[in-house]
Amino acid sequence: MIIWTWRWKDDKGVRFVERFYDDGSKYVTEYHPDFIWDYRITKDGKRLAEIHTPNYDHLDN
């Protein structure tokens, strides 16, 4: 279960959404200009289940 969510933006303009869970893990989504990167970090600090998807918002379809 999600305990809380933190949203922030770094100095380069990359937006982050971090979802913290009651088991000590967190799920992070990074919104870069041309791709989105999702991954889970366990309570031990291991990075799991990385997903890299292109960002199609900037394309004219």
Explain the meaning of each model-derived region:
Residues W6-D60:
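Acidic, low-complexity, intrinsically disordered interaction modules
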